[in-house]
Curated annotation (Swiss-Prot):
Descriptive protein name: NADH dehydrogenase
Originating organism: Thermus thermophilus (strain ATCC 27634 / DSM 579 / HB8)
Functional pH dependence: Optimum pH is 5.0.
EC number: 7.1.1.2
Pfam families named in the record: Nitroreductase
Amino acid sequence: MEATLPVLDAKTAALKRRSIRRYRKDPVPEGLLREILEAALRAPSAWNLQPWRIVVVRDPATKRALREAAFGQAHVEEAPVVLVLYADLEDALAHLDEVIHPGVQGERREAQKQAIQRAFAAMGQEARKAWASGQSYILLGYLLLLLEAYGLGSVPMLGFDPERVRAILGLPSHAAIPALVALGYPAEEGYPSHRLPLERVVLWR
């Protein structure tokens, strides 16, 4: 499949992006979604654990159920696609051979596995979920920028009942759910963004 070129460069996408809650009815091609997701999955993570997982929801009935779990937010049902970003650290830890670099072999590989396992053994379940969520927000940032660059509008959502989302999608009880992302071709411009100036938030030492 021929790659789709992004519409915008990274800086332009970052400056232009707004949250979009109204979408055209046009479906988002699966090939385009795959291309965006593959690029987003290049996001970095500590130890390269990549604890994030994504459910791509296009089924109308499932979106309707997710809307109810998201306290009635209409764009959850009306968007052509909803991404459910969840974090499953337990799955990542159970498959360390998938994430440790293939160039690391022998004793170094075993030592790295043991170091990772020791680091998380002392953590309780909630701390592990919080850690995995924090890593997943890095992916979320990549994803939002890429969607904008490829001409798609999106809005990240943290307002939902995670237990209901887990039940709807059959996710494991230990999984954290950092965000939902509604997306599609924009049917509105969205509100102009308002951000603090660099001088307010950046310290130079």
